[in-house]
């Protein structure tokens, strides 16, 4: 479901992981 895809993108945990990945790079 397309609604479930953006849901995980808007998740706070996903955002934190994204920042960590960028910070680690």
UniProtKB/Swiss-Prot annotation:
Binds 1 zinc ion per subunit. Its EC number is 3.4.24.-. Its main location: secreted. Signal peptide: none annotated. GO terms for biological process: proteolysis. Its cofactor is Zn(2+). Expressed by the venom gland. Ca(2+) binds at residue 17. Inhibited by EDTA, EGTA and 1,10-phenanthroline. Addition of Mg(2+) or Ca(2+) increases the casein hydrolysis rate. One of its GO terms (cellular component) is extracellular region. Residues 14-25 form the Peptidase M12B domain. It is found in: Secreted. Monomer. Snake venom zinc metalloprotease that possesses high hemorrhagic activity (minimum hemorrhagic dose, MHD=0.86 ug) when subcutaneously injected into mice. Has potent fibrinogenolytic activity on alpha-chain of fibrinogen (FGA). Hydrolyzes model substrate (beta-chain of insulin) at Ala(14)-Leu(15) and Tyr(16)-Leu(17) followed by His(10)-Leu(11) and Phe(24)-Phe(25). Negative results: does not degrade beta- and gamma-chains of fibrinogen. Belongs to the venom metalloproteinase (M12B) family. P-III subfamily. P-IIIa sub-subfamily. This is Zinc metalloproteinase-disintegrin-like daborhagin-M. It comes from Daboia siamensis.
């Amino acid at each position: 479901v397309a609604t479930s895809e953006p849901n995980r993108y808007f998740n706070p945990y996903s955002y934190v992981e994204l920042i960590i990945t960028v910070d680690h790079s």
